[in-house]
């Protein structure tokens, strides 16, 4: 029996194909690192390009590290909203645990107003935890912070006076939270990295699930897709299409893509890995991840074929390609966006239709 999440399998045009960035600080063509301010403006320029090329959605992630210039995605999305007309604008993710749900809702409702109803939010617990000490939160409260704040956010989505009480923020009594969205709804996803408990929580709240598949064979996430679908069926909550986000890079040839991406990717991965106890990344591991794992790197045809195979295997309804990694050249990033919009997206749809 078909499932509501499977509608794109019969209609590839329903598949949402997007781009994702953390606002990595790039280099110019002479190899000079841009300032944070210039890096943020570069994200806006790339979003404008993507909008004109028919990319469905642009997601901007929140981080609080020197490698990434964007700490408040919704502020960048608001700027993008005023220069674009059709592309959907999403966070990827917003770290709800170290933020206030009321303020998050208000900020994204404002982006929704500026964009004419194109705003989406992906809520996450935070795989990078720099925001917790920065904003005065205890990592020991990691679970309860997200659980309670997500519960409040779901109530805010009903867009009526809210009464709520928990342990992580002051209570609300018939609170009016403004602005309201024109449509009466705000598309909301929960970012999931591979925890069954996170999958069940997302299903219980009736929200869409966005899988962060950043390493290893993507097929290993099939049980989480199945669990989400079974849970929504059993709980009677809305059955949303499942989304996924994976890193990758598009260039004119496979060799160019692999060589351009390798050094910036290795540098940022090793910098983070050193803090988490990971060994340095070897070139053989990088190549293996491209061939059999979750790096979508190569020419438009190579990337499109791998994306289509993953979409077909997992049955996802949205695929966001994280196309920035460390200090890539600005010109290479612009070319990647161009190739993704003009070649990869049409190829993926054709492959799935066939």
Each PLM stretch: what is its role?
Residues 17, 54, 62, 80, ...:
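Conserved, mostly hydrophobic/aromatic
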Residues 3-15, 19, 29, 100-207, ...:
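Internal, glycine-rich beta/alpha segment that forms the wall or movable "lid"
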Residues 53, 114, 205, 313-314:
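Structural motif
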Residues 37-49, 193-200, 302-309:
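Short, acidic/polar
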Residues 1-88:
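N-terminal beta1-alpha1-beta2 module of alpha/beta enzyme domains
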Residues 2, 8-13, 19, 143-177, ...:
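An alpha-helical appendage that flanks or caps ligand/catalytic pockets
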Residues 25-40, 94-102, 184-194, 291-300:
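Active-site mouth loops of central-metabolism enzymes
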Residues 17-21, 58-60, 89-91, 119-123, ...:
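Hydrophobic faces of well-ordered beta-strands that scaffold small-molecule active sites
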């Amino acid at each position: 029996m078909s499932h509501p999440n499977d509608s794109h399998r019969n209609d590839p045009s329903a598949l949402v194909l997007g781009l994702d960035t953390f606002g990595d600080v790039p280099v110019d063509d002479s190899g000079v690192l841009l300032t944070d301010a210039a890096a943020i403006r570069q994200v806006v320029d790339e979003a404008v390009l993507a909008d004109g090329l028919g990319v469905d959605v642009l997601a901007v992630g929140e981080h609080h590290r020197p490698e990434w210039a964007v700490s408040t995605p919704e502020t960048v999305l608001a700027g993008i909203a005023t220069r674009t007309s059709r592309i959907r604008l999403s966070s990827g993710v917003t770290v709800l645990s170290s933020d206030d749900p009321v303020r998050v809702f208000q900020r994204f409702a404002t982006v929704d107003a500026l964009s004419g109803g194109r705003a989406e939010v992906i809520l996450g617990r935070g795989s990078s935890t720099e925001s917790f000490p920065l904003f005065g939160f205890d990592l020991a409260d990691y679970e309860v912070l997200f659980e309670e704040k997500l519960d409040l956010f779901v109530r805010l989505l009903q867009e009526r006076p809210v009464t709520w009480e928990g342990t992580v923020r002051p209570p609300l009594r018939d609170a009016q939270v403004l602005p309201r969205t024109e449509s009466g709804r705000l598309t909301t996803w929960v970012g999931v990295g591979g925890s069954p408990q996170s999958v069940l929580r997302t299903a219980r709240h009736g929200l869409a699930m966005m899988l962060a598949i950043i390493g290893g064979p993507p097929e290993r996430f099939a049980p989480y897709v199945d669990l989400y679908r079974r849970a929504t069926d059993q709980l009677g909550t809305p059955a949303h299409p499942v989304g996924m986000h994976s890193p990758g890079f598009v260039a004119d040839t496979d060799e160019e893509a692999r060589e351009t991406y390798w050094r910036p990717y290795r540098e940022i991965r090793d910098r983070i890995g050193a803090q988490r106890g990971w060994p340095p990344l070897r070139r053989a591991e990088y190549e293996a991840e491209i061939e059999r794992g979750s790096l979508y790197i190569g020419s438009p045809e190579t990337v499109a074929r791998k994306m289509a195979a993953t979409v077909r295997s997992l049955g996802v309804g949205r695929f966001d390609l994280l196309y920035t990694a460390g200090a890539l050249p600005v010109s290479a990033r612009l070319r990647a966006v161009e190739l993704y919009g003009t070649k990869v997206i049409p190829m993926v749809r054709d492959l799935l239709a066939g």
